[in-house]
């Protein structure tokens, strides 16, 4: 794919409309992050995004979800009120309050706060990373830096503080393994297919039979076209302006 010749700089409101006009479901007034990369189609309806987001085709988020620095694969199902990678406070300083590390927060105009507050480093835990075909239940909290493998399921209300294996089902506070979705051999074969990267319309009748699906995929792999989607990137130029680029892609035949 190559950058579209229509790359342009747009005010925020027009950039949001551009997404809406190109199969990305967002509400009017959507808060664009500093950097956005989205394969179309995708849905971010009533979702708050900060810093950066990369999201794959057919992934969607529920109302009230908040994301901060996330990378999400294709075909991910994210329910309502999910919290991704919120900022953390240092625990080794005298105080966990912003007065110990962020002089621009909240009370910056207060004389005492301004005199005492000092900018100090807060280690960055990293992006939240979801593979492909991940299902996140309602009201889940995912700590910054956590990676969740393809095919995993996170139960509603869980607090995820560790990495999650592909096809692992976890739940609870803190989240712990409930079971694996499939036996190890089948999970490994299913992961190896990378079906989310291929046009598998010819295999749709076996979607409810994972072993039959994998057998058919392995037989037909060479004839299954790769899926390539149009991709939109938006990068903030200043407070109210974004550079928009569209990478075009032909639909599979």
Descriptions of predicted regions:
Residues 2-16, 21, 25-28, 99-142, ...:
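C-terminal segments of enzyme domains that contribute to small-molecule binding surfaces
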């Amino acid at each position: 794919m190559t950058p579209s010749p229509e790359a342009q700089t747009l005010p925020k409101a027009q950039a949001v409309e551009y997404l809406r006009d190109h199969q990305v479901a967002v509400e009017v007034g959507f808060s664009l992050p500093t950097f956005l990369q989205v394969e179309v189609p995708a849905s971010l309806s009533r979702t708050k995004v900060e810093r950066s987001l990369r999201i794959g085709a057919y992934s969607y988020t529920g109302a009230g979800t908040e994301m901060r620095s996330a990378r999400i694969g294709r075909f991910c199902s994210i329910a309502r009120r999910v919290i991704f990678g919120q900022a953390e406070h240092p625990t080794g300083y005298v105080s966990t309050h912003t007065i110990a590390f962020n002089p621009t927060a909240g009370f910056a105009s207060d004389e005492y706060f301004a005199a005492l507050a000092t900018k100090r480093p807060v280690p960055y835990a990293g992006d939240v990373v979801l593979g492909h075909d991940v299902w996140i239940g309602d009201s889940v909290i995912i700590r910054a830096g956590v990676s969740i493998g393809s095919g995993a399921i996170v139960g509603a209300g869980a607090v995820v503080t560790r990495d999650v294996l592909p096809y692992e089902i976890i739940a609870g506070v803190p989240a712990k393994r409930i079971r694996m979705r499939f036996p190890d051999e089948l999970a490994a074969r299913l992961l190896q297919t990378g079906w989310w990267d291929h046009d598998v319309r010819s295999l749709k009748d076996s979607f409810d039979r994972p072993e039959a699906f994998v057998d058919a995929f392995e037989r037909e792999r060479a004839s299954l076209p790769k899926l390539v989607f149009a991709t939109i990137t938006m990068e903030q130029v200043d407070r109210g302006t974004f550079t928009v680029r569209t990478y075009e892609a032909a639909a599979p035949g």
